[in-house]
Amino acid sequence: MPLIVFVIALLALFAIELMEPVQIWVIQPFTAAIAKVSAVVSQTFDSTVHAQGIVLGNIETGAAVSIQPGCNGVEAMIVLLAAILATPAGWKHKLIGIGLGFLAIQIVNVIRIVSLFYLLQWDPVWFEWAHLYLWQALIMLDGLIVYLLWVRMLPMVGDDPSSRAGDSP
């Protein structure tokens, strides 16, 4: 049953993400916010970086990366969300997993965007390799690790705190 829930949730969430109103009102503003956060992080050591919409750019060199669909962490979050929804657990635990998972994926994604921005300026060939192979795998691996850590922190089925050793009279 969890596999069926996972597949249905995955398909539904991806279908919702692709809807034009969701793209316009949720995904594009979210992606622009990720670009802004990436610029703020970069500005701590490079004042020439700025964000305009979904583009992270360098004012002096003109180098820029555009954060396109698939590069904003949304797909990794969808996979994690579907996995959490399919796992038997209480809603409190699911919401904690979703919240912490969102943070973990987006922190790694900002690191990804900033590193790719500078890698592009250093060597476009290495940028392409890191963008297409290394970081795609690492973002999904991040989601998997978050999921496994979340599952590990779930209480065991039938885990009654009063039945633990040392708690009985």
Whereabouts are the PLM-identified features?
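Hydrophobic N-terminal alpha-helices or hydrophobic patches in metabolic proteins across all domains
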Residues: M1-P169
